[in-house]
Amino acid sequence: MDQFEVLVAVERLFFAWEQISDKETLVERLEGRLADMNLSLSTSPHRSLFLPYLGTRKDHNVADPDTISSEYGLQLLVLENALAHNYSKAISLLESSTVGDVGYIEWCRCMMRLNILGKSYGNNSELDIGLRSYLRNGAQGSSLLLTDEVSDCRMLGFASLFLQEEYFIAVHHMVRSIHEHPSLVDYLLREEDGRDIFILKEEYKLMLTIAVLVAIPLENYQDFLLLEDLNPLLQGLPELHVCLNLLVSTSFGSFFARWLGPIQELANRSCFLAPVWHSVNSHMRSKILVFYIKISERVTVSYLARTLDIPYDTVMADVSSLIQKFDINIGIEGDLVYYKEDLPVGNLVSKVSQIQREIDSKLLVMKQKNDALRSFIENMLKEQSVEPLNRSQDMDAFELHEQSEDEEYEEEHLEEGENV
């Protein structure tokens, strides 16, 4: 099953429809690809948009499984239902299939893609657990660990966490995946090969850039930059590297020029990232505003707008939202944001801390676990230097860090602040 990318091609066409000038050419091209697979755009829920540009091909009928071979019939039925957005039916068909027909890794990849298309992102955590167990127990030391299919599965797992807005867990997933599959960095940074593209490499890299910036606390950016084993990845993500350095140097205006410039532009062009951009952008602005609220007793909205290079009205709305949402004892008089005088200093500190906790619980989790993350990465370096004969001992140490076997990873409870 290597034709799932055509499904996302339909969704990309629908997403970018208003910005497309040569609609007829693109629709005809996509219709031709689908026809070669015995599929038709007429079965898509977006057909009302495409109808004026569809050719004169015969209407497509759903394939009868009794008249076609079992392997081809299964693939056709899965694709047919997914194209029609009957994702639960497509997933059910694939789940009931014989894994041996396509191989376990490819089966996982197909399932993960269907879950992403159907926005059932949480299901991919279980698939990632099963894949990791399979690779560790059944494919240890084999060339399977180096295949692009495995790398794609690990990236699909990362994307699923990102699209759930689980940014810290997504970063954790990437760090662990790089440790388990060092070839993943090469896969991510390598140019597209033009075959079977589901999520673009540029989209993966943008997701990772955003996840790191949002999840890691301001005071820990410098530590992240100094993690030597992540240098190849950081060097391959120049936008992330530049943004981290700007934030470390508190050049917030320059950072937001990039954040609201090329990063926002790329995100809004992606059918995967655009739906979460508003939330991501709000997280990032609030994160910087909380920084100023924590260190300042009195600050003006105009100063914040000027320093962050964000429109005055946007900053005023953000500050007002913070005050209203978290019921903190801070007042606004005209342009001035200040702590109310009747608030004891101890309570003031507590209230400011509450802002940071509640704006994004994952930020707090990251603060609590930053030392564990650093220790985790240091352990990777130690494990990689141990002889292969000691690998079983290394794996035990690695799993001790995770505090569980693979089947417990789904419930790491990171959102509840438990230790890694």
Curated annotation (Swiss-Prot):
Checking InterPro entries in the record gives: PCI_dom, Rpn7/CSN1
Q: Where is the PCI domain?
A: 177-346
What are the start and end residues of every segment in region (Disordered)?
386-420
Composition bias type Acidic residues, residue spans? 404-420
The answer to whether keyword Nucleus applies is: yes
Query: What are its GO cellular component terms?
Result: COP9 signalosome; cytoplasm
Q: Where in the cell is it found?
A: Cytoplasm; Nucleus
Q: Report keywords, A-Z.
A: Cytoplasm, Nucleus, Signalosome
Its quaternary organisation is: Component of a COP9 signalosome-like (CSN) complex.
Function as written in the Swiss-Prot or TrEMBL entry: Component of the COP9 signalosome (CSN) complex that acts as an regulator of the ubiquitin (Ubl) conjugation pathway by mediating the deneddylation of the cullin subunit of SCF-type E3 ubiquitin-protein ligase complexes The CSN complex is involved in the regulation of the mating pheromone response. PCI8 may also be involved in transcriptional and translational control.
The protein depicted here goes by the name: COP9 signalosome complex subunit 11
**Species of origin:** Eremothecium gossypii (strain ATCC 10895 / CBS 109.51 / FGSC 9923 / NRRL Y-1056)
Origin organism lineage: Eukaryota, Fungi, Dikarya, Ascomycota, Saccharomycotina
